[in-house]
Amino acid sequence: MKKIENLKWKNVSFKSLEIDPDAGVVLVSVEKFSEEIEDLVRLLEKKTRFRVIVNGVQKSNGDLRGKILSLLNGNVPYIKDVVFEGNRLILKVLGDFARDRIASKLRSTKKQLDELLPPGTEIMLEVVEPPEDLLKKEVPQPEKREEPKGEELKIEDENHIFGQKPRKIVFTPSKIFEYNKKTSVKGKIFKIEKIEGKRTVLLIYLTDGEDSLICKVFNDVEKVEGKVSVGDVIVATGDLLLENGEPTLYVKGITKLPEAKRMDKSPVKRVELHAHTKFSDQDAITDVNEYVKRAKEWGFPAIALTDHGNVQAIPYFYDAAKEAGIKPIFGIEAYLVSDVEPVIRNLSDDSTFGDATFVVLDFETTGLDPQVDEIIEIGAVKIQGGQIVDEYHTLIKPSREISRKSSEITGITQEMLENKRSIEEVLPEFLGFLEDSIIVAHNANFDYRFLRLWIKKVMGLDWERPYIDTLALAKSLLKLRSYSLDSVVEKLGLGPFRHHRALDDARVTAQVFLRFVEMMKKIGITKLSEMEKLKDTIDYTALKPFHCTILVQNKKGLKNLYKLVSDSYIKYFYGVPRILKSELIENREGLLVGSACISGELGRAALEGASDSELEEIAKFYDYIEVMPLDVIAEDEEDLDRERLKEVYRKLYRIAKKLNKFVVMTGDVHFLDPEDARGRAALLAPQGNRNFENQPALYLRTTEEMLEKAIEIFEDEEIAREVVIENPNRIADMIEEVQPLEKKLHPPIIENADEIVRNLTMKRAYEIYGDPLPEIVQKRVEKELNAIINHGYAVLYLIAQELVQKSMSDGYVVGSRGSVGSSLVANLLGITEVNPLPPHYRCPECKYFEVVEDDRYGAGYDLPNKNCPRCGAPLRKDGHGIPFETFMGFEGDKVPDIDLNFSGEYQERAHRFVEELFGKDHVYRAGTINTIAERSAVGYVRSYEEKTGKKLRKAEMERLVSMITGVKRTTGQHPGGLMIIPKDKEVYDFTPIQYPANDRNAGVFTTHFAYETIHDDLVKIDALGHDDPTFIKMLKDLTGIDPMTIPMDDPDTLAIFSSVKPLGVDPVELESDVGTYGIPEFGTEFVRGMLVETRPKSFAELVRISGLSHGTDVWLNNARDWINLGYAKLSEVISCRDDIMNFLIHKGMEPSLAFKIMENVRKGKGITEEMESEMRRLKVPEWFIESCKRIKYLFPKAHAVAYVSMAFRIAYFKVHYPLQFYAAYFTIKGDQFDPVLVLRGKEAIKRRLRELKAMPAKDAQKKNEVSVLEVALEMILRGFSFLPPDIFKSDAKKFLIEGNSLRIPFNKLPGLGDSVAESIIRAREEKPFTSVEDLMKRTKVNKNHIELMKSLGVLGDLPETEQFTLF
């Protein structure tokens, strides 16, 4: 911003003149106003094209105002006034009609306005009351409301937090003026953010529901922090400045206000029976917990959950409602498909097609509602004996002019109808043409209901005839994507016709019907009554779903709902998950079925003119009938007249009373408060929803608000009370409290699992440690076995043991993850190689056993070599000192989470093995729910900005983003998780099932619920795919060495974690002081930096580094500082969660408290004052206490030991079998291997590495390329080389060892890929290639591949074509 002071122009004296090009504003401050100022404003506006604000007020250019009025008003005075406020142009329009007209004109004149207005101008429309003379010109009168730009508040001193007190007039974020100093703004806090730096800043985000504002606290952060929180209503006072193009309040004082909440003050509360949450696929923004919290605040006794098409929120909803003391009602708003509708209706005789007379008809109408719209054209064709024998056609003059839209659709203009007969004259004549014929039409309900209703209106007759729908016939007899008349005609090859003219449509529909009659005869249908057989062949994907609410009444109903939901996703998913009406009828026990919104079957039929008897027949299917406030209108019904909707709801009420059905008023809730509507609009904006801005009032209403809406419809307080309070409560009383999940494990049953686990454990224990067992081993084994068996977890151990043994027997090692290495039983069963006993020696011959209690040794592998003092044999070294409590809790009752890393090549076989053990219908993939992440939510809001043309402030964008974040987007599956259903249960006892992401080609079913929600009820086996076991398998195949037999104390292997000496390379040329390139968990730049700083000398220190690198806020800003400051050594800092418990017990703390502190810290919850006090009493060092406070997540030691063990084995091969290591590495991890670059040598590799490392941000591919090139450089520096691919020698995928070199495989050639590479090997195995021509003929190689091969010498001296010689 440029600022000039003490300036003079003509007779105008300036205090200052500031130019802000980013905001497009010139700020002028003068001593006093004069006539010359107007000239100055015009001059500055002309020269700068910016808005000019004098002393905080924009002196708008009269010419500009006139141009805007001329451009937008035209000949009609829609705009009363044009006002500039900061960067906003406010157009004051005369009424709602004028607002709509000007909104339309703003879009069409955008280009001209952009040229007139300064950059960044936001245009707002404000409806004002038209003057009396304009009211006479039929400009609609708006609601009488005044929206003051500021309000006076009475502030109590005790609510003042600090600094300046509020000014007399207080603004809200949507009503503020830019550049007003000493401004007070009132709003609700929705976010607080603290930014640390040279200067600490506290950002407070305020909103009034219409707009939002960032308030910055600079010098008084400590006075504010902890005094205000999200949800508080405050008045912030300070300087309102324009920062980065938008207003920002620099806070100098804050006062807290009591929140003016909407509250339910009714003595008897209602029950909400229709509400959607963020689990309704990208449609609602209601948070489950906030929904329950609001219901509790309002005193609702019960609330329902009815998400679109799924029940995934049920577990979260139940937990929240239970805690709040509210009855949860589980349900769904289903996409119901009526597969039981008749093809022919009102059939009274059983004629054959040849005997019956049919009239095929089509109407053109002024709209879709027979109650209010009129027939303007009739076209009809009569069929007898399979032949067209007569036609009828007429245009009809309606009682009022037809709309432009109707003319566009039908091609019929008002002029064409002016001299035509009325419906009163036409109908008797047309009935004479019909006689006793059977009606035929395409989408026959529409035409039939129009005809029947107008016969009643005009002639007073209750008229009914049999009628056949060719649309329903098409869905039974044809397979099409669309069943429109056009599509059917095209499929049957009946030629072009003039659509949307009645006689043309009737003629072609007659041809369609006759063709269908022939098709029916071929399948044995010759009589009218036999047409009902066609119902069984109707394609469910062709049927249009309608909404239907289903509530769970009891446990049986919950299971039935789960079955219905499962089938809707697995059998009947088409665009949406569809529930067939026939299946709902079959599984209806324990369910209550509601009619849902106006898009439901009943509402739709009523709007389409169904008779009372038809509506009664439809209503009989439902247990209760829903009505909704008039401002809750389905998005595709926004043009629906409210008076018409009133009539429909009143009619449905009468029918329900006649049938003794409950009528309930529901809210169709999609967000909690009226001001949240903009959040849902932003959610819908990028989804192609044309009407996203015009949000219906889909918020949660109080009892009083709902009663007011019911009175608006029924104009009767008793009925209002009945539908709002009494009936919803009666339905809630009919529903039992159902617990969806018991929160106790239901393990699968394996006969004698307890006994097998005990026997296998003891057998192995005796084999290793002798019989009798050493006391420490005996006590540990007994403690673990008792916890495992008594809590029913033996079967989990047995499953894992069988899986590991199967993999090992097939030649693939298995790595353990998580805390399972804390269990000695798991080690003895072979589930994990991690031994959790203290570091110890054991003799494999005489079973001598010795525990080493020496703080220098944190791992048994680090113990000095020693011979058995009893028999002289070399002693084995083992043990890592890991307490069992970290795995199964202090009481041994925590569900054991056994995670196993299988080779990626073997994972699918492991999954199939589990299915064989328990049966395919008892094993399901663990389901996940993918939601909109914060970054994606920003994209939604930006799309909203683009489509509305409204530039949002950063604060308002934050508010909308927070609403959208967490909305369900799709589903998926855990990478290796399998959920096991016990043999005596069905999956529907726990969860519905579905395909991941609704992909029928996935080949697997997942749990419908996110696996975390059912983890306590079902056994979850994590059989993950991982590169490391594949790496180990390949190394074993290449060297013949069993990786499980390598020495875990090999000094040269250990040395590469602190230097490059064992590799024999120059660290400067390698650009690394340590030799861990390519070693899992230790090859990244971050961990290599840790290795350089710590220079580990033992296996135990490697474990600590692994823990430190995997934790959050454990190394940086924590352990690293304590080491550098000299407070602790690497061996003393907190690196894994077990360190806390072990250290505190060593200090004398009671073990259960030590365990609680460990659990708190590992989850990032810090420590309580009581914990801190006890730690100080035991003289725990202050740095240790502070370290506990900083940690956000801690890695389990067992997991670290497992990772380091795998890494150490791979490192052993790198040191002692280098070419085998590099062959395995590049084969398995070399996705970004570039043969062209690598074959150029080390200098080319170095150049590319410098380029990559200079990039500020690298994606996953670039990071992988860096890793691959680092290992390639290292290999070359160690004296090895790469050989180019060779058409006669290379493998498809594997790097092959040739002398001191690696032969590059075919799949590493750019653009070639596995499929082409494998085709080369197959062809080569059949017979050698004789020419390039032969190569291309017998493989998938193309010309581009050939050119690349030639450039790299892959083809050698292979001739271009076949060469034949006689001699």
UniProtKB/Swiss-Prot annotation:
Which branch of life, at top level? Bacteria
Q: What InterPro entries does this protein's entry cite?
A: DNA_pol3_alpha_NTPase_dom (IPR011708), DNA_pol3_finger (IPR040982), DnaE2/DnaE/PolC (IPR004805), DNAPol_HHH (IPR029460), DnaQ (IPR006054), Exonuclease_RNaseT/DNA_pol3 (IPR013520), NA-bd_OB-fold (IPR012340), NA-bd_OB_tRNA (IPR004365)
Question: Which Pfam families does the entry link to?
Answer: DNA_pol3_alpha, DNA_pol3_finger, HHH_6, PHP, RNase_T, tRNA_anti-codon
Q: Which Gene3D superfamilies match?
A: 1.10.150.870, 3.30.1900.20, Metal-dependent hydrolases, Nucleic acid-binding proteins, PolC, middle finger domain, Ribonuclease H-like superfamily/Ribonuclease H
Membrane-spanning segments: none
Per UniProt, the keywords (alphabetical) are: Cytoplasm, DNA replication, DNA-directed DNA polymerase, Exonuclease, Hydrolase, Nuclease, Nucleotidyltransferase, Transferase
One GO CC term on file? cytoplasm
Name-wise, this protein is: DNA polymerase III PolC-type
> What's the family?
Belongs to the DNA polymerase type-C family. PolC subfamily.
| All copies of domain Exonuclease, residue ranges | 358-513
Cysteine pairings via disulfide bonds: none
- Please state the Enzyme Commission number of this protein: 2.7.7.7
As for what it does, the entry says: Required for replicative DNA synthesis. This DNA polymerase also exhibits 3' to 5' exonuclease activity.
Principal localization reads: cytoplasm
Its annotated compartments are: Cytoplasm
Reactions performed catalytically? DNA(n) + a 2'-deoxyribonucleoside 5'-triphosphate = DNA(n+1) + diphosphate
Its Gene Ontology molecular function terms? Answer: 3'-5' exonuclease activity; DNA binding; DNA-directed DNA polymerase activity
| An example Gene Ontology biological process | DNA-templated DNA replication
